[in-house]
Amino acid sequence: MAASGSRHPPISDDATSFAAQRERMVAQQISARGVRDPLVLAAMRQVPREAFLPERMRDLAYDDSPLPIGHGQTISQPYIVAAMIEALQLNGGERVLEIGAGSGYAAAVLAQIAGEVTTIERIGALADKAAAALAALGIGNVQVRQGDGSRGWPPGAPYDAIVVAAGGPHLPQSLKTQLAIGGRLVMPVGADQSAQRLVRLTRTSVDDVRCEQLADVRFVPLIGDEGWASVAPEPRADRPATVRK
């Protein structure tokens, strides 16, 4: 007979099911679409996406789509989370800044690779929920801050990598200056709020940067002093929306 307290708590059927779904997600949605970094794939296998969703939505946790989390914000599609983190080219142990904590899911994935993660969220209620979800999972190397993410978080600078989970009209100067030499900034950028290009900026010296365009994406807008002033209204139902080609 096993000694009292020597066994782990039983694994629930739900936990087993979610773990299997998570493995399929990595194989079918992420690896199959070109994400190859073993650190990123391992991190995506490790973090339970369902823990960052309301109870009523947890059955959708491993769908290949973004999901609403309230306040006009979303938890990003799993593939996009993986692709953006891969674009940061992390080796492990870095200091990372995330703009747009949202649910906290991407910060949890980053925390499996980076040494220290600071994530900024403009909306206080979401910042509180993200912090609670991270704490419930015992993730201790993430600091959640509320503030204007377009201005970064100077107290923690310089950062080895910065990832922005919202689309802005340009790359904020504050984020560029908070990058370490050799650091990478990955962010969606577009001239309007309906669609963006995913851009990677590498700071090659104090005064020089290199920019690459990676993919077409669509994110919620980055609201702030160095982003958009406000969310643009949706197109009226009685007028056709503009189609971008």
Curated annotation (Swiss-Prot):
Active site: S76
Record Pfam families: PCMT
Coiled-coil features, chain-numbered ranges: none
SUPFAM superfamilies per the UniProt record, alphabetical: S-adenosyl-L-methionine-dependent methyltransferases
InterPro entries per record: PCMT (IPR000682), SAM-dependent_MTases_sf (IPR029063)
Database matches in PROSITE patterns: PCMT
Major subcellular location class: cytoplasm
Keywords tagged on the record: Cytoplasm, Methyltransferase, S-adenosyl-L-methionine, Transferase
EC number, as in UniProt: 2.1.1.77
Subcellular location: Cytoplasm
GO biological process: methylation; protein modification process; protein repair
CDD domains: AdoMet_MTases
GO MF annotation, one: protein-L-isoaspartate (D-aspartate) O-methyltransferase activity
One GO cellular component term noted in the UniProt record for this chain: cytoplasm
Family label: Belongs to the methyltransferase superfamily. L-isoaspartyl/D-aspartyl protein methyltransferase family.
Function, in words: Catalyzes the methyl esterification of L-isoaspartyl residues in peptides and proteins that result from spontaneous decomposition of normal L-aspartyl and L-asparaginyl residues. It plays a role in the repair and/or degradation of damaged proteins.
Protein name: Protein-L-isoaspartate O-methyltransferase 1
Source organism: Rhodopseudomonas palustris (strain HaA2)
